[in-house]
Amino acid sequence: MAHLGYWMLLLFVATWSDVGLCKKRPKPGGGWNTGGSRYPGQSSPGGNRYPPQGGGWGQPHGGGWGQPHGGGWGQPHGGGWGQPHGGGWGQGGTHNQWGKPSKPKTSMKHVAGAAAAGAVVGGLGGYMLGSAMSRPLIHFGNDYEDRYYRENMYRYPNQVYYRPVDQYSNQNSFVHDCVNITVKQHTVTTTTKGENFTETDIKIMERVVEQMCITQYQQESQAAYQRAAGVLLFSSPPVILLISFLIFLIVG
């Protein structure tokens, strides 16, 4: 890791040194009294790169005779007769659009639901709600339960509740806690809606949630490892020296 940091430092020092020298070189032409024309309307030996825009006689910015900025006769900025800045009859731009329904407002319930995944759920003692998952394909060892699961999988949760992985000593502890809280919350919510779960439902739901909790643990463990690796990389002395040097070049 240290050798890699030193090589990165040497590479960026060489690159930014060349960039710093380039910044100090004067730019030819284009300035005041430097011989170049910075404005398209002025003649130059090479011709005009930006020819003047417009339409027919007396048309500034295109349009018919006497039309500023295009549009019909007597229309400033385009639109129908008597329409300033376009719009329907008697409409001043986008204001006072008579007779048009207002735009639908975004439901705050939808916004809250979209931001729920990965956030701490209030009232559950620090548990977070995971992202939605596809329900796993599980074989339960007999045709009846396999068929029952296929026909009723929509009744089972597709998200799990969990705490951060650093609060557990191993995967089994995480999964056990995750299954218990998820099954409990889903059962209470479903019962409140007037539905009931049978013993078969509970058995199948525990298996399904267990697989989802294992997946959640793997995702959280990988994310925690990547965060730790990033902190370790940026805390190494060569990288700190490199960042300090880059800041010096940018500011200077």
Curated annotation (Swiss-Prot):
Gene3D superfamilies: Prion/Doppel protein, beta-ribbon domain. Sequence repeats lie at residues 51-59, 60-67, 68-75, 76-83, 84-92. It holds the Pfam family Prion_bPrPp. One of its GO terms (molecular function) is cuprous ion binding. It is found in: Cell membrane; Golgi apparatus. GO terms for biological process: cellular response to amyloid-beta; cellular response to copper ion; cellular response to xenobiotic stimulus; intracellular signal transduction; learning or memory; negative regulation of activated T cell proliferation; negative regulation of amyloid-beta formation; negative regulation of apoptotic process. Glycans are attached at residues 180, 196. Residues 51-92 are annotated as: 5 X 8 AA tandem repeats of P-H-G-G-G-W-G-Q. Residues 1-28 form the signal peptide. Keywords: Amyloid, Cell membrane, Copper, Disulfide bond, Glycoprotein, Golgi apparatus, GPI-anchor, Lipoprotein, Membrane, Metal-binding, Prion, Repeat, Signal, Zinc. The keyword NADP does not apply. Residues 230-252 form a propeptide. Cu(2+) 2 binds at residues 69-71. InterPro entries: Prion, Prion/Doppel_b-ribbon_dom_sf, Prion/Doppel_prot_b-ribbon_dom, Prion_copper_b_octapeptide, Prion_N. The keyword Metal-binding applies. It is a lipid-anchor; GPI-anchor. Disulfide bonds join 178-213. Residues 26-109 are annotated as: Disordered. Cu(2+) 4 binds at residues 85-87. Cu(2+) 1 binds at residues 61-63. Monomer and homodimer. Has a tendency to aggregate into amyloid fibrils containing a cross-beta spine, formed by a steric zipper of superposed beta-strands. Soluble oligomers may represent an intermediate stage on the path to fibril formation. Copper binding may promote oligomerization. Interacts with GRB2, APP, ERI3/PRNPIP and SYN1. Mislocalized cytosolically exposed PrP interacts with MGRN1; this interaction alters MGRN1 subcellular location and causes lysosomal enlargement. Interacts with KIAA1191. The normal, monomeric form has a mainly alpha-helical structure. The disease-associated, protease-resistant form forms amyloid fibrils containing a cross-beta spine, formed by a steric zipper of superposed beta-strands. Disease mutations may favor intermolecular contacts via short beta strands, and may thereby trigger oligomerization. Contains an N-terminal region composed of octamer repeats. At low copper concentrations, the sidechains of His residues from three or four repeats contribute to the binding of a single copper ion. Alternatively, a copper ion can be bound by interaction with the sidechain and backbone amide nitrogen of a single His residue. The observed copper binding stoichiometry suggests that two repeat regions cooperate to stabilize the binding of a single copper ion. At higher copper concentrations, each octamer can bind one copper ion by interactions with the His sidechain and Gly backbone atoms. Its primary physiological function is unclear. Has cytoprotective activity against internal or environmental stresses. May play a role in neuronal development and synaptic plasticity. May be required for neuronal myelin sheath maintenance. May play a role in iron uptake and iron homeostasis. Soluble oligomers are toxic to cultured neuroblastoma cells and induce apoptosis (in vitro). Association with GPC1 (via its heparan sulfate chains) targets PRNP to lipid rafts. Also provides Cu(2+) or Zn(2+) for the ascorbate-mediated GPC1 deaminase degradation of its heparan sulfate side chains. It is linked to Found in high quantity in the brain of humans and animals infected with degenerative neurological diseases such as kuru, Creutzfeldt-Jakob disease (CJD), Gerstmann-Straussler syndrome (GSS), scrapie, bovine spongiform encephalopathy (BSE), transmissible mink encephalopathy (TME), etc. This is Major prion protein. It comes from Oryctolagus cuniculus.
